[in-house]
Regions:
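Active-site rim/loop-helix segments in enzyme catalytic domains that contact anionic ligands
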Residues: 1-131
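Metal-dependent de-N-acetylase/amidase catalytic core
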Residues: 2-37, 117-261
Length: 261
């Protein structure tokens, strides 16, 4: 199909979804609860810190789930993994406070070794059922050139847990089923929604600066994030934005239309 044909089809799919109560453009603004799931401490801030700050400021309950302990995130050989894990946990809790996040959940897997297992998926689904979010955030596991296995596995595990958490016969011992309406992928190369974070970029950067153990390599990233937010903002005519790939639950299984919208 030509670009014009794909664009028309995407508009048609969005219109169809709206008829059934799914408005992906409004998903970040209409959620009562948002759960941001991160492979490591600081990923939610980098990928969606502006959205989390804005949502919290507007009365949305925001939560984080960090899958690993962050114990490999250093270039300094003198620090132990246990010491670094404790430090990064403290930093994450402080950063979450800056963004207005109500609670940070931890699974505690070893950084660099996030397992792609049924057990990990069930643990994520358990938190989804506990928090009952309308919108779940996760790294896009299909982003090209993503070299970190924790990011790829996290995205896949969250996608599966997002789908499975609504099935009553899946892990019934973990609680009542809950079906979030949308999953939003950050770190994505194929965004379909740009969230206006004008007025909240400074809060995002403030939260990131709480990750002091990462500051050695963070300064260039902070500058890059500003440029990235500026470029994303131009897509919707605002100063700063965060790009996301947002999908409703009905498009995450056996329907290739998710690639188009």
């Amino acid at each position: 199909m030509s670009y014009e044909e794909i664009s028309r089809l995407a508009d048609l799919i969005r219109s169809y979804l709206k008829q059934y109560g799914y408005d992906i453009d409004e998903a970040p603004y209409t959620a009562n609860r948002i759960l941001c799931i991160a492979p490591h401490p600081d990923d939610c801030e980098v990928g969606a810190g502006g959205l989390l700050a804005k949502a919290s400021d507007h009365g949305t309950e925001t939560y984080m789930l960090v899958l690993t302990d962050g114990s490999m995130g250093t270039s300094r050989p003198g620090i132990s993994r246990d010491e670094l894990a404790l430090r990064r946990r403290r930093e994450q809790e402080e950063a979450a406070k800056v963004l207005g996040v109500k609670k940070v959940y931890w699974l505690g897997y070893r950084d660099g070794f996030l397992p792609y297992t049924d057990e990990a998926r069930l643990r994520i689904a358990t938190i989804i059922r506990r928090v009952k979010p309308d919108l779940v955030l996760a790294p896009d596991p299909w982003m090209m050139y993503e070299a970190h296995p924790d990011h790829r596995r996290a995205g896949l595990l969250v996608s599966e847990a997002f789908l499975y958490s609504g099935f009553p016969l899946y892990g019934p011992e973990t609680g009542d089923p809950w079906s979030p309406r949308y999953i939003a992928y950050y770190y994505t190369g194929r965004p379909n929604v740009y969230v206006d974070i004008t007025g909240y970029l400074e809060k995002k950067l403030e939260a990131l600066k709480k990750h002091e153990s990462q500051l050695e390599g963070l300064e260039p990233l902070l500058k890059l994030l500003v440029v990235y937010a500026e470029q994303a903002g131009k897509k919707i005519g605002v100063k700063y934005a965060e790009p996301l790939k947002i999908l409703p639950r009905i498009l995450v299984h056996a329907i290739p239309l998710a690639e188009i919208i």
